[in-house]
C-alpha cells in the first residue's frame, strides 16, 4: 500500500531528478500490477535479480518490518542508497548494525519518519531550541484511532510486524516528539499493551481511511482477528537523560474519539499540537499565543504528503545540497525505545537502556 500510495507517487513528482526503473514484490502479479499502473519499465519477484540487473542508485524498502534488516543490508551491499519504511528495526543492536554497514559502504540510509514534515512541528522545534519554553520537564502524546485496525496486510501479525499500534502509528509520533525536544536519549521505559477489542468485537464496520489507507489498498488480504498477536493499545512512560518525562497513549482501537495530540511543558511556556498554541505569561498577564503558520509547500494536500517532502529532502542529501535530518543516532534512539517498551510490557516492569545493550 505505502509503495503505491506514498513512495511511487512521490518519486514521480520529482521526475526531473529521479527515474523509476523497477519494482519488486515476492508476489509476481502484484509487482506486475504496480509496474503497469505506474508505467515502471521493469518488474521482478526476485530482489537479488533486480539489484544485479538494474544497479539502482536508490532503493525504497516498503515491506513488513521483519524483512527490513535483510533487505536494507542486501540493497546497501549492492551499492544502493536506501530509504526504508519505519521502523527500520525494533531492536537497538540491529539498527546499530545497519547504520554501521551503511557508513562502511559510504551509502545513505534514511528512515521514513515522515511525520516530522509538518510546519507546526518545525515551528515547535524552533521555539524549543530557541529557549521559548525554558527548561522542558514533561511531554505527552495522545495518538488514538477509534476503530483504525489495519484490516489489510500483515500489520496485525507479530512475525511480520514485530509490534502493533506503537510500531505502526506510535513510532511516527514518538519520533516527531523526540526530534522536537532536541533528541534526548531515552534512558528507561515502562510499557503496557492490550488487545481486548480486536478479539472480542465482531461485526463493527471499519473504514480503510481510519486505518491509514487514505488512498485505498491494491492487494487486500483477508483479515482474520484470530491471527492478531500484537497490541491494539499501547501506553508508556519514558525517562530521558535530559530529565524529561514523556507519557504516551497509542491505539488502533479504543472507545474514544480519534485524536492526534501532543503537549510539551517548560518552565517558561508550554505548547500543544497539532494546532500549535503556546501558553505562558507576558508581563503580569497570562498569555495564549497562536502563531500564524503556512504549509510546507505544494504537496500538503496529497495523501502521504510527508513522503513527498522526505524524498525531496533525500534528493537534496544525495546531491550534496542538504544535510540529513533523520540521523542515525535519532533512529537508534527510537529503536532502543521500542525494544525497551516491548520488553517492559512483557516483564511488567521498567526496563533501562543498559539492559538492551
What residue ranges belong to the model's regions?
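Conserved SAM-binding strand-loop segment of SAM-dependent methyltransferases
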Residues: 40-47
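N-terminal Rossmann-like dinucleotide-binding module
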Residues: 1-38
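Contiguous beta-strand/loop segments that form the cofactor/metal-binding neighborhood of enzyme cores
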Residues: 150, 175-279, 310-321, 339-340, ...
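C-terminal helix-rich "cap/oligomerization" subdomain common to oxidoreductases
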Residues: 58-60, 104-107, 241, 313-357
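Predominantly a Rossmann-like dinucleotide-binding segment in NAD(P)-dependent oxidoreductases
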Residues: 2-3, 115-225, 348
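Beta-strand-loop-alpha-helix segment that lines the small-molecule cofactor/substrate pocket
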Residues: 51-53, 57-58, 64-65, 69-116, ...
Amino acid at each position: 500500500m505505502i509503495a503505491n500510495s506514498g513512495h511511487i507517487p512521490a518519486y514521480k513528482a520529482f521526475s526531473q531528478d529521479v527515474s523509476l526503473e523497477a519494482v519488486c514484490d515476492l508476489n509476481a502479479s502484484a509487482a506486475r500490477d504496480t509496474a503497469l499502473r505506474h508505467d515502471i519499465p521493469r518488474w521482478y519477484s526476485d530482489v537479488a535479480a533486480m539489484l544485479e540487473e538494474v544497479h539502482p542508485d536508490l532503493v525504497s524498502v516498503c515491506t513488513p518490518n521483519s524483512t527490513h534488516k535483510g533487505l536494507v543490508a542486501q540493497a546497501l551491499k549492492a551499492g544502493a542508497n536506501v530509504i526504508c519504511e519505519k521502523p527500520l528495526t525494533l531492536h537497538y543492536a540491529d539498527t546499530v548494525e545497519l547504520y554501521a554497514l551503511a557508513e562502511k559502504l559510504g551509502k545513505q540510509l534514511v528512515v521514513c519518519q515522515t511525520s516530522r514534515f509538518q510546519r507546526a512541528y518545525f515551528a515547535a522545534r524552533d521555539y524549543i531550541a530557541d529557549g521559548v519554553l525554558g527548561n522542558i520537564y514533561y511531554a505527552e502524546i495522545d495518538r488514538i484511532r477509534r476503530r483504525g485496525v489495519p484490516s489489510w496486510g500483515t500489520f496485525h501479525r507479530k512475525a511480520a510486524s514485530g509490534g502493533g499500534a506503537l510500531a505502526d502509528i506510535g513510532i511516527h509520533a514518538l519520533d516527531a516528539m523526540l526530534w522536537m525536544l532536541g533528541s534526548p536519549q531515552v534512558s528507561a521505559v515502562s510499557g503496557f499493551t492490550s488487545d481486548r477489542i480486536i478479539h472480542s468485537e465482531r461485526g463493527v464496520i471499519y473504514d480503510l481511511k481510519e486505518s491509514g489507507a487514505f488512498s485505498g489498498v491494491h492487494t487486500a488480504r483477508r483479515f482474520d482477528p484470530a491471527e492478531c498477536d500484537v497490541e491494539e493499545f499501547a501506553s508508556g512512560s519514558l525517562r530521558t537523560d535530559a530529565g524529561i518525562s514523556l507519557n504516551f497513549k497509542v491505539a488502533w482501537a479504543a472507545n474514544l474519539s480519534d485524536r492526534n495530540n501532543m503537549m510539551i511543558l517548560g518552565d517558561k511556556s508550554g505548547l500543544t499540537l497539532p494546532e500549535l498554541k503556546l501558553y505562558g505569561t507576558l508581563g503580569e498577564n497570562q498569555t495564549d499565543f497562536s502563531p500564524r503558520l503556512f504549509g510546507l509547500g505544494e504537496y500538503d494536500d496529497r495523501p502521504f504528503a510527508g513522503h513527498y517532502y522526505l524524498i525531496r529532502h533525500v534528493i537534496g542529501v544525495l546531491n550534496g545540497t542538504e544535510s540529513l535530518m533523520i540521523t542515525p543516532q535519532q533512529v537508534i534512539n527510537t529503536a532502543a525505545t521500542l525494544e525497551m517498551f516491548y520488553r517492559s510490557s512483557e516483564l511488567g516492569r521498567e526496563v533501562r537502556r543498559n539492559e538492551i545493550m
